[in-house]
């Protein structure tokens, strides 16, 4: 889609700057929107890549898995789950014990990852709430910078499920709503 790359970069820069102001370390250093380029710290991903989802509502794959136990749209208090980045296997869920057994991260690193996920998601959620938007869930990627667990990749509209007045917001519309474009 025309312009998606720069739109995602603008959105990422917006949130990375909010995180920086909140004292949360990420891989982001700077960006040049015109050149569609972002300067980042050198990081090492977890294993072959790990996606970390923070959920505030029971929707999507969470609801499909657990619908017999929870009402669709029920509130979740920053529930965190992890999946291995593996398209061929459908990005399978992996537990903290599984991550340790596979040598991807220790239990202590998982605790740090979970804490960081909830802090980052809270900053994003608060920013969206101020714009009359409701964050239902968001997907992040983290990695190592030295021994520190930090946010890497992007914080783009396509990585989050957001609602306005009870209706899901299309990712391209979300960028415009958030950035006032």
Regions found by a protein language model. Name each.
Residues 155-181:
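C-terminal helix-cap and adjacent tail motif
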Residues 27-33, 129-143:
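A short glycine-rich, hydrophobically flanked beta-strand micro-motif that places a catalytic Asp/Glu
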Residues 105-136:
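A long amphipathic alpha-helix within ATP-dependent nucleotide-binding catalytic cores
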Residues 54, 135-154:
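Conserved metal-phosphate-binding beta-hairpin within the catalytic cores
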Residues 1-84:
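Active-site loop/lid in soluble adenylation, ligation, and acyl-transfer enzymes
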Residues 1-7, 89-116:
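Short histidine-centered catalytic/ligand-binding loop motif
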Residues 78-90, 121-132, 156-160:
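Phosphate-binding core of ATP-grasp and ATP-grasp-like enzymes
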């Amino acid at each position: 889609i025309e312009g998606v790359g720069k739109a995602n970069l603008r959105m990422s820069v917006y949130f990375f700057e909010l995180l920086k102001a909140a004292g949360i370390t990420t891989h982001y250093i700077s960006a040049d929107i015109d050149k569609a380029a972002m300067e980042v710290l050198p990081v090492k991903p977890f294993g072959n890549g790990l996606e970390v989802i923070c959920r505030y509502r029971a929707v999507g794959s969470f609801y499909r898995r657990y619908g017999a136990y929870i009402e669709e749209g029920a509130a979740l208090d920053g529930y965190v789950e992890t999946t291995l980045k593996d398209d061929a296997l459908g990005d399978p869920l992996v537990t903290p014990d599984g991550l340790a057994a596979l040598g991807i991260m220790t239990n202590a690193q998982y605790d740090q990852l979970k804490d960081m996920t909830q802090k980052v998601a809270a900053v994003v959620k608060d920013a969206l709430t101020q714009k009359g938007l409701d964050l239902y869930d968001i997907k992040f990627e983290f990695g190592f910078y030295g021994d520190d667990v930090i946010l890497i990749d992007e914080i783009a509209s396509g990585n989050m499920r957001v609602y306005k007045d009870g209706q899901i917001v299309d990712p391209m519309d979300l960028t415009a709503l958030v950035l006032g474009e």
